[in-house]
Amino acid sequence: MEILNTIESINFTTLFILFIGLKFTIETYLKYRNINSIKQNEGRVPKRFENIVNSEEYKKSTDYNLDRLKFQILVSFVSIFILLLLTLGGLLSWLTQIVLGITSSNILGAILLGFFIIIISEILEIPLAIYSTFVIEEKYGFNKTTKKTFVTDIIKNLIISSVISCSIYAVVIGIIENLGSNWWIFAFGAVFSIQLIIFFLYPVLIMPLFNKFEPLDDEQFKKPIEKLLEKVKFKAKGLFVMNASLRSSHGNAFFTGFGNNKRIVFYDTLLETITPDEMEAILGHELGPVSYTHLSLPTIPQVEFS
């Protein structure tokens, strides 16, 4: 009983504000530490890279990273603003009243409410996306995104986010209505399961909506990669090249999916600028976390969200 009384006496609004404030403070502190570290070494190419990177390229790299870090802090501010606007600002209550005036169905109401929230969030985040793509990325010569691609991406994101989020809301409301006082256990399990399914299907259903993926056929890259994968006993469903040049000149390689659906993806921009030996080194860097089972860590945010 004492525990129950203690729980009932907790001011959850205060806890909510403290949690959000603490999270933002820690993240911002770490970003400022990175900013200060970059500034301390600004203008001085590290000795081990003096024969690889010239001072002009190094300055461009540091300036770009500083701009990105400052932008990330701004994004954190905006995210908190949207969250507080929805909760403490009363926007969520206002939207709920609108939904109640449209339908008496709890499930349909949850779907409409989720859709309204996504629409508002997307609209508020558009200026940030524009600044990131057409100001920062453009400034440093990385942007290749056309206005048409930018708008198309927003529409696709909106549709996909709406379908996934509204489906989750409908499932949770259905569980609340039908499974009694222990609904939260079943809701947690359902949300977590849906997220794992999405994580599994993401590389084969969602990613192809935004980019084209072709099998890696270049033998000078493919052979050393397959040899390295065999050495570390990493089983991938395939090696793919993504048309990242549609949006950016950045080069990258990454893993996606899990279980029997793991894939290795290379940006086409990366293959255009490196040698097979360099590719093997890059992939070795990416494979490192596999040896320490870091690929299972994405499930932690899923648990937190659930």
PLM features: residue spans?
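Polar-ligand-bearing catalytic/cofactor-coordination segments
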Residues: I3-L295, S306
